[in-house]
């Protein structure tokens, strides 16, 4: 019901009648002594109490899956981790991190899913992932977290690319001066994209304000197209460090763009496995 905000759709998913769904909600409201949903016109809206109950339910579901797997492995020497990472982290940060962890914990069996932030959070909610490393935004009310690192987020172009506003005078060029360029951007749901959208929103701009928009869900393809002069992009410095060092990609100097963003280690808020996840994170982060 929380997901659909509609009794009929919830009943169809659960294969029960709509009155049965309504009755279950009434029983819950009576038990907790508060409204879980209210009507605003023709819309059903989740109350704050309803949101808290939904969050607690998702945490319980996550812990149930994790506990079931843990129980199945009682007596086994092998440790099994199900972790996720966003594409930037998965391709440019995670490999060395995992290598260090595997050397320290050779008994561990690691299962890694690389996807965008919204998909990873959904997999955590479903109990299919223990935790994830993400750069996108997430609800602090629903997830516990620790900061892994703080990374520069920069505008980039190919080595020989010239913007319509020029590229050499950082005292003059502003973000809005790039709107005449083609923009290569990640797909919706990507943390890398959401960071840019929020930055632009703070400047009363949008990705749709650029002359042309190319949506690409692969960072390597984006970097290749940038190198070939097909437009500009905004990526984490960690994702283009090699190309910057080689000179095939360069940072666009902007007067009004000096952005850093955190990479986060996240798990369900209130999880009974929170202490264990923190210990694993400590091992993953340790570079010695």
Predicted regions and their residues:
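Central regulatory/effector-binding core of bacterial HTH transcription factors
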Residues: 78-141
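Flexible hinge/capping segments at coil-to-helix
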Residues: 143-188
């Amino acid at each position: 019901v929380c997901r659909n905000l509609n009794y009929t759709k919830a009943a169809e998913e659960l294969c029960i009648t709509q009155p049965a769904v309504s009755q279950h909600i009434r029983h819950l409201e009576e038990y907790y002594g508060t409204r879980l949903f209210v009507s605003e016109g023709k819309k059903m809206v989740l109350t704050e109490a309803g949101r808290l109950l939904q969050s607690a339910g998702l945490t319980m579901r996550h812990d149930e899956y994790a506990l079931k797997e843990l129980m199945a492995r009682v007596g086994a020497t092998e440790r099994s981790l199900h972790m996720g990472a966003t594409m930037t982290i998965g391709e440019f940060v995670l490999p060395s991190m995992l290598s260090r962890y595997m050397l320290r914990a050779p008994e561990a069996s690691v299962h890694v899913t690389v996807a965008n932030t919204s998909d990873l959070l959904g997999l955590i909610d479903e109990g299919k992932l223990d935790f994830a490393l993400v750069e996108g935004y997430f609800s602090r009310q629903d997830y516990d977290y620790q900061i892994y690192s703080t990374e520069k987020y920069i505008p980039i172009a190919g080595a020989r690319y010239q913007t319509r506003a020029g590229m050499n005078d950082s005292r003059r060029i502003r973000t809005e001066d790039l709107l005449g360029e083609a923009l290569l951007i990640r797909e919706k749901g990507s943390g890398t994209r959401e960071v840019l959208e929020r930055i632009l929103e703070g400047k009363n701009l949008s990705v749709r304000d650029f002359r042309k928009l190319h949506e690409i869900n692969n960072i390597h393809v984006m970097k290749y197209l940038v190198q070939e002069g097909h437009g500009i992009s905004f990526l984490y410095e960690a994702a283009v460090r090699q190309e910057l060092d080689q000179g095939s990609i360069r940072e666009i100097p902007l007067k009004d763009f000096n952005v850093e963003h955190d990479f986060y280690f996240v798990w369900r808020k209130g999880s009974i496995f929170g202490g264990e996840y923190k210990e694993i994170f400590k091992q993953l982060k340790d570079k010695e």
